[in-house]
Structures are given as structure tokens and as C-alpha cells.
Amino acid sequence: MRFQLRSELTRKSTSALIVWFLFGVVVFPGCSTQTTLPADSAAGGQPRQRVEDVPQPAWGIATVSVACARENPGHKSELGTQVLLGHSVRVWKKSGSWYEVETHDGYRAWLELGTFELFSAEAVNRWQHANLAIVTALETVIRERPDGQSDVVSDAVIGCLLERISQEGTSCKVRLPDGRQGYLPASVLEDYADWKKSRRPTTDAIEATARQFLGRPYMWGGNSPKALDCSGFTQQVFFLNGIDLPRNASQQAGCGAPVTLTPDLSHLCKGDLLFFGRPASSRGPARVTHTGIYLGNGNFIHSYDRVHISRLGEPQAGPENQRRRLPIAARRVLPHLP
């Protein structure tokens, strides 16, 4: 049956059940905290626009490969997070062409209309129950025809969600949330429901996934293959292995179980999350400012300048504790490890 979306908002309440697109299948209760951002501050010196509540329930779906959500309405505002194509958001407020949205992990930031579309609760529910496929290649393109030479409809990155229409040879015809259609190699897609069921997070799988991102640039607020900040990197790696983490490093530091840190690192296992920053002292509590994934033998992978592998304790320029890469905490989130 052909799936069709209507871009709309409804002023009526609905009993339709909206199932959030959680970025994985393992969720740690109590980890995710909602970050409510100021909605009525002027961004980057731009003229202040009136902020209005949006009639509820209101939803949206990202319609570009990576939609950039900013801390305040306006292009000059700081990047807060990113939303991948085909993923839904809850919509709360409006300021001009900008909408305050809430992502699956509770993060609130502002998306510009055009990078996402507004949909009713019923339309989002239909999308979530369509024949969805997830992109499994780091980067790919959707073309007008299955020939590899026609014009590009959109790019896509790993984790994007598309509706699968049909397969034609080695190509797959897909539909985007806004109704656009195109083709991409069938080899870069996997049935989303099957993909979620097949996630088996192991230490080797975590390492292999993390290494796919080596060399990708750092960008504050980024959590896509195009560019990632430290916690966006760890969130993506674990999402691709079926584990859902909160957005920020300080929130991730509350997930899983604590791991004792000793000079010989004997308690650490591959796949553990490492946290860096200011340790607790008489001057104040501990403050997490950076995170990475332990690989074993004193090595860890993280996004700083770019995604790369560092060695614990190696000297680096910058503030003492963080740049010497001495962790102040570690957490174990892989469920099968002791």
C-alpha cells in the first residue's frame, strides 16, 4: 500500500499513540534529562521575533540528511544538536520560520522550517509504521533515477530513515518524509525493524563502529558523520549498536555502572565510556567536559579536533587534567560485561 504524508498541524487533540524513534533498543532509565533552552532571547544580534506556543500535539520530521538544531532561533545561534533525515521531533514553540523542537533524547533546540516539515500526530504515526529502511553507509546520495548519473535528490548519512517503495535491480526506490522520491543502492539500506532486532552490542562491534568515524572533523553540537562533538560521537557509536545514550557528556556520565579507575587501568574494559574534566575538589564538584571510548591497552577514541585515537596520560596542550587525558570517571554501558 502506498504511504502518503500530509504536511499539517492539527488543533484537535488526538489519541493516536506516537512512538518516539529512540536511537537504539537499549535505553537507560533516568539517564536522559530535558534541557529547556531560552526561547525568547535574540540570537546573534538578530531582531527579536515573537515566540508563540504551537497548538498541541505538534510534530515534525527532518527532511534533509542532517538538520541543524540551534540553541536559539537564528542562523547565528550556537549549534545545539542535529536531527537525521526521517527522525521525528516534538514541536513546542514558533518564532518566525524557526520552531523549538524536542528530540528523542529530550534535548530542546530550534529547527528552521525547510530542514524539517510539520506533521500531525497521525501523520507521524503513519510514517513510523511505514516500510522504513535505515541507511547503513556513512554517506550516500539519493538520485532521480537508478543510473548513478542523474541529479541528486538528497544526500543521506548513516542512521537516516527512508520509506522503501521497491527494489529495481541493485537499486532501491525510496520516499522521503516530504514526498520526494529517488533511488540509491540497495546495499546501503537495511529494513529498520530487522536492523533494530539484529543489534548485538559487543566490545568488538563498538570498536569497529567507532573506527568508521576516524578522521571525521569535530564540530560543537554535531552528532552526524559530517562532523561530531565528543558526546555526539559516543552517542552515534552506541546508537548504531542498539544502545541509546543521552546527548551530552555530563548526562552520559550517569549511564550504566561506574568503573573503578586505578593507575594500571586494570578495571577498564574495551567499550567503557571515559569522562574527562575537572575532578571534585575543595573548590567544587567534578565537572565533565569531554568523553571518549576506551579501546584497551591505554588507548581510547574520541572526537577532539577530529575523531582520532589517543593514549591515556599522554601530554597535550591545554588545561591540565583534560589535555593530559586523565579520566575523572568511567562508566560501563555494555549490558553483558561484568
What is the meaning of each model-derived region?
Residues 33-57, 87, 95, 102-136, ...:
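Boundary regions of SH3-family modules and the immediately adjacent low-complexity/disordered segments
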Residues 16-30:
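Bacterial N-terminal signal peptides
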